[in-house]
Amino acid sequence: KSINSTSLIYFTIMSDILTLTLKKYWGFDFFRPLQKDIIKSVLDGHDTLGLMPTGGGKSITFQVPGMILEGLTLVITPLISLMKDQVDNLKRHNIRAVYFHAGMTHREATTAWDKLINSKCKFLYVSPERLSSERFCNELKSLNIRLIVIDEAHCISQWGYDFRPSYLNIKKIRKIIPNAPFLALTATATPEVVTDIC
């Protein structure tokens, strides 16, 4: 089956944009295996499951499209230390990002929200527990969220070794933000866990 010239040009241009973005912000010349396939799926608007080994570069699969898309990328992650590390790392690359978790004081949350609204952030990291707040979820409606990432997605599944009931709050987000694709990322998942995630 031949690919028409318009499609070929599109794929070539998109591939160049992805590689240039990777180089500009992270200094890498090449993607690792599976990264580009996952990124292209997300940019085509598809809900996507990314099964990649620990250390395989899962963060790049949402950070690169997050820089290309107009608007905000919402990242749901269970570990506060991990979200802090990722936000700090993005800031070192001159990328604006904030985080919210259930343990923040009112003042900390207000300061983070002000940064989110006033500084054109590209990434918003939240703990799944934060999504239990109806007020917080309603505030998400006012944001231009273009991609939703579920890190450690195996925590969704009751079959998983690390099931977290708070991950069930993620269902609300689909109703609140129906048009943004979901990217679920995990290093390991049995067939039962994959079925639950999908």
Question: Which residue ranges define each predicted feature?
Answer:
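Conserved pre-motif I regulatory segment
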Residues: 14-53
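Pre-Walker A (Motif I) flank of P-loop NTPase domains
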Residues: 44-50, 71-72, 120-122
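Walker A/P-loop
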Residues: 45-64, 76
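Conserved phosphate-coupling serine/threonine residues in phosphotransfer and NTP-handling enzymes
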Residues: 54-56, 127, 186-188
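Conserved nucleic-acid-binding Ia/Ib motif block in the N-terminal RecA-like helicase ATPase lobe
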Residues: 74, 80-126
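Conserved helix/coil segment N-terminal to the catalytic DExD/H
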Residues: 105-147, 157-161
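Post-DEXD/H (motif II) to motif III coupling segment of the RecA-like Helicase ATP-binding lobe
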Residues: 142, 146-150, 154-198
